[in-house]
Curated annotation (Swiss-Prot):
It is found in: Secreted. This is Ampulexin 1. Residues 1-26 form the signal peptide. Expressed in venom sac and, to a lesser extent, in venom gland. Not expressed in brain. The keyword Secreted applies. Keywords: Secreted, Signal. Amphipathic peptide which probably adopts an alpha-helical structure. When injected in subesophageal ganglia of cockroach P.americana, a natural host for larvae of A.compressa, dampens the escape response for about 1 hour which may contribute to early stages of hypokinesia. Has no antimicrobial activity against E.coli DH5alpha or B.thuringiensis. Is not cytotoxic in vitro. It comes from the Eukaryota. One of its GO terms (cellular component) is extracellular region. Monomer.
Length: 50
């Protein structure tokens, strides 16, 4: 089960990275892409699980 979580985590990171590159510079903190924010929220929930 843990392996699935790790795989999912890595996939999400890859998706977020590609979305950031498509949107332009990752330094734009004033505007957050909703899809990107959703990805970060999911990652946070995964991190909080023991």
């Amino acid at each position: 089960m843990k392996a699935i979580m790790v795989l999912f985590y890595v996939m999400m990171l890859t998706i977020i990275a590609s979305v950031s590159m498509v949107n332009g510079s990752p330094g734009k903190d004033d505007y957050v892409n909703p899809k990107e924010q959703l990805g970060y929220d999911i990652l946070e929930k995964l991190r909080q699980k023991p």
